[in-house]
Amino acid sequence: MSSIRSAFLALFFALTLAACSTAPPAGINPVTSFDLNRYLGQWYEIARLDHSFERGMSDVNATYLLQEDGSVKVINRGYDTQRQAWKEAIGRALFIGDSNTASLKVSFFGPFYGGYHVVALDQKDYRWSLVSGPDRDYLWIPARDKQLPVDVREQLVSQARS
């Protein structure tokens, strides 16, 4: 009985780790020549693929703060329209590889991390980006302002679809 239980636990942990993938999805190439210090600060969510953890949320924004240990404190905040209350989630992000490649892993609970990959970025002013999660079902368009020029938004949506 103990060997069956051990096998079950091993399978459970293997599946859990696979579900918490931090590598970029196939075909996704994170931005290189990335400057974390320029990326820090507040970003507003312009568009997203909807998921249960953000469903019904409006005015979503994220703030990234550099910590003394080199990690990044992530503060996600949004207005829950059903409950008519603000919700906040605090997490921690770490670079997966070198700090010049915009590929990080983020955790909002315990040892479980998911990928955060900047795949397009306004390299000149860091005003907008396109972010992929652990797979192509998780995509966001954050920007420094609450609105993006229509042509920029359309370009990012087109890139996200390709």
Feature-to-residue mapping (PLM):
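A beta-rich soluble binding module of mature secreted/lumenal proteins
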Residues: 20-162
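Bacterial N-terminal signal peptides that target proteins for export
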Residues: 1-9
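Bacterial N-terminal signal peptides
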Residues: 9-18
